[in-house]
C-alpha cells in the first residue's frame, strides 16, 4: 500500500525553516441569515493576509464523512486518519499527563444530566473545571475496582474527565457509551471482540455506579464514556519532517494528540492571547509550532453564532503579532467544520490559508468559506496541508530527475 507520508518524508531536507500551523477548531460553517461566522466577523487582518496568500479548502477524511477532532488533526499533521484510528481517550489521557501502560485502556468521559430515561444534557451544563474536579475526587473515593479491573479517574477541563481501566484481558474495540444527542435514550457500550466485551461490560457497570454515587446532584448525575483506546504506535513528527515541533494548546485532548506524534508540549495560559504570547516567547526554541484555538468549536457545538464570531475576531486581532515573527510559512485552518445550525461537527470542507513569500498573491480578497472555495489551492485532502507547508518553506527536494 502506498504510504504518502513515508514518500514525502524521503523528500524532506535538513533546511531550517519556521512554520506556524494555527488551528481554529471547528472553523468552517454554513450561512445563518446569509453569512457564516467568518463572513460576519470583522477580520481586517485575516482578510489582508488572504490577499497575500493562497487559499483553498480541505477534506479531513473523505467527502461526506464527518470527522472527530482526532482524525481532523492527524490529517493536518500529515497522517492518514483512516490508517491511524486513535480513540480520544488516549489523547485526553496523555494531554493531562496520565501514564498509560500495556494493561491499560483509557477512555474520555463527560459528566452529563440524566433523568433515568434520556440524556438531557451531554455536558451537564458545562460545569467549571474546579467543580468537576471535586466530583472526580468523590468518584475516586467511592469507586476503585469493578470485577478484577482497577478504575482510576482523572479530572479534565469543564465537564470532561478520563477513566483508566487497568487489568488483564481488556480490549479497546468498544463502541461509545453515549447517545451523541440530547433528548435520546442512553446507548450503552458494546464490545466488538472478546477482550473488548469485558471492557464494555465493566464500562456499563461503572456508569451505573457513577449514577448511584451522583444521584442527589441535580445536574452532574451521570457520565458518558467514549473513545476507548490503548497506546498506539505512530511515526514521530520530528523524524518524519526533520523539524523540532512544539504544541501550544490549552485543552488536554489536543496536547495529547501532539504528544502522541512526538511534539513537545509548551506550557501556556488559558486564553488565545496567552498562547500567542507563548509563541513569541518560545520562538527560537522550535522549527514548527502547532497553535490550537478551541472556542470556535465550542460555540459552534453550542449553536452560539455571535460568540463564535467574537472568537474569530479575537484571533484576528492577534494575527499581526504572529506575522511580526516573520515565519517562513503561516497556515491558518480548522480541523473540521462545526456549523452553528447543526450544533455538531460536519462533513463540510474547511477553510485553508497558506501565507509565505512564494504564494500567488492578489487572487483572493478575504478569508471565508466562499473565498476559500474559489482559491488557488482548490479542494484538497487535509493530509496534503503539511506537504504544502514544507514546500512553501523550501524543505522538499525535487522528485525525480
From Swiss-Prot:
Functional description taken from the UniProt entry: Catalyzes the interconversion of 2-phosphoglycerate and 3-phosphoglycerate.
Pathway: Carbohydrate degradation; glycolysis; pyruvate from D-glyceraldehyde 3-phosphate: step 3/5
PANTHER family reported in the protein's UniProt record: COFACTOR-INDEPENDENT PHOSPHOGLYCERATE MUTASE (PTHR31209), METALLOENZYME DOMAIN-CONTAINING PROTEIN (PTHR31209:SF0)
E.C. no: 5.4.2.12
Name of the protein described by the UniProt record: Probable 2,3-bisphosphoglycerate-independent phosphoglycerate mutase
GO MF: metal ion binding; phosphoglycerate mutase activity
Organism: Thermotoga petrophila (strain ATCC BAA-488 / DSM 13995 / JCM 10881 / RKU-1)
Pfam families xref list: Metalloenzyme, PhosphMutase
Family as reported in the entry's similarity comment: Belongs to the BPG-independent phosphoglycerate mutase family. A-PGAM subfamily.
NCBIfam families: apgM, PRK04135.1
GO terms (BP aspect): glycolytic process
Principal EC category: isomerase
Disulfide bonds: none
Residues passing through the membrane, by range: none
Gene3D superfamilies (alphabetical): Alkaline Phosphatase, subunit A
Keywords: Glycolysis, Isomerase
Reactions catalysed, as given in the entry: (2R)-2-phosphoglycerate = (2R)-3-phosphoglycerate
HAMAP family linked to this entry: ApgM_B
Amino acid at each position: 500500500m502506498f504510504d504518502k507520508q513515508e514518500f514525502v518524508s524521503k523528500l524532506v531536507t535538513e533546511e531550517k525553516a519556521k512554520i506556524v500551523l494555527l488551528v481554529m477548531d471547528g472553523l468552517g460553517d454554513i450561512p445563518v441569515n446569509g453569512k457564516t461566522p467568518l463572513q460576519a466577523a470583522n477580520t481586517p487582518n485575516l482578510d489582508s493576509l488572504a490577499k497575500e496568500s493562497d487559499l483553498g479548502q480541505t477534506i479531513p477524511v473523505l467527502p461526506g464523512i464527518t470527522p472527530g477532532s482526532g482524525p481532523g488533526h492527524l490529517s493536518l499533521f500529515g497522517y492518514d486518519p483512516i490508517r491511524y484510528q486513535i480513540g480520544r481517550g488516549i489523547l485526553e489521557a496523555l494531554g493531562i499527563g496520565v501514564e498509560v501502560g500495556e494493561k491499560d485502556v483509557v477512555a474520555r468521559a463527560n459528566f452529563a444530566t440524566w433523568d433515568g430515561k434520556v440524556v438531557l444534557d451531554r455536558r451537564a451544563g458545562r460545569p467549571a473545571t474546579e467543580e468537576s474536579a471535586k466530583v472526580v475526587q468523590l468518584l475516586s473515593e467511592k469507586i476503585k475496582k469493578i470485577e478484577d479491573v482497577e478504575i482510576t479517574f482523572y479530572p479534565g477541563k469543564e465537564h470532561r474527565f478520563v477513566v483508566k481501566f487497568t487489568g488483564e484481558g481488556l480490549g479497546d474495540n468498544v463502541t461509545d457509551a453515549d447517545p451523541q444527542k440530547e433528548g435520546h435514550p442512553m446507548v450503552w457500550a458494546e464490545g466488538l471482540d472478546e477482550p473488548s466485551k469485558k471492557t464494555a461490560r465493566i464500562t456499563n457497570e461503572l456508569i451505573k455506579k457513577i449514577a448511584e454515587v451522583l444521584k442527589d446532584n441535580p445536574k452532574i448525575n451521570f457520565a458518558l464514556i467514549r473513545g476507548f483506546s490503548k497506546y498506539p504506535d505512530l511515526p514521530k513528527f520530528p523524524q518524519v519532517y526533520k523539524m523540532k515541533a512544539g504544541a501550544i494548546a490549552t485543552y488536554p485532548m489536543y496536547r495529547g494528540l501532539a504528544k502522541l506524534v512526538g511534539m513537545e508540549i509548551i506550557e501556556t495560559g488559558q486564553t488565545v492571547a496567552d498562547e500567542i504570547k507563548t509563541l513569541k516567547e518560545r520562538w527560537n526554541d522550535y522549527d514548527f509550532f502547532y497553535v490550537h484555538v478551541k472556542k470556535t468549536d465550542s460555540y459552534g457545538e453550542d449553536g452560539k453564532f455571535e460568540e463564535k464570531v467574537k472568537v474569530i475576531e479575537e484571533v484576528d486581532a492577534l494575527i499581526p503579532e504572529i506575522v511580526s515573527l516573520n515565519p517562513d510559512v503561516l497556515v491558518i485552518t480548522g480541523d473540521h467544520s462545526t456549523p452553528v445550525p447543526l450544533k455538531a461537527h460536519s462533513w463540510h470542507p474547511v477553510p485553508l490559508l497558506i501565507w509565505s513569500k512564494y504564494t500567488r498573491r492578489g487572487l483572493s480578497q478575504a478569508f471565508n468559506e466562499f473565498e476559500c472555495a474559489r482559491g488557488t489551492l482548490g479542494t484538497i485532502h487535509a493530509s496534503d496541508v503539511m506537504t504544502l507547508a514544507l514546500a512553501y518553506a523550501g524543505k522538499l527536494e525535487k522528485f525525480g530527475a
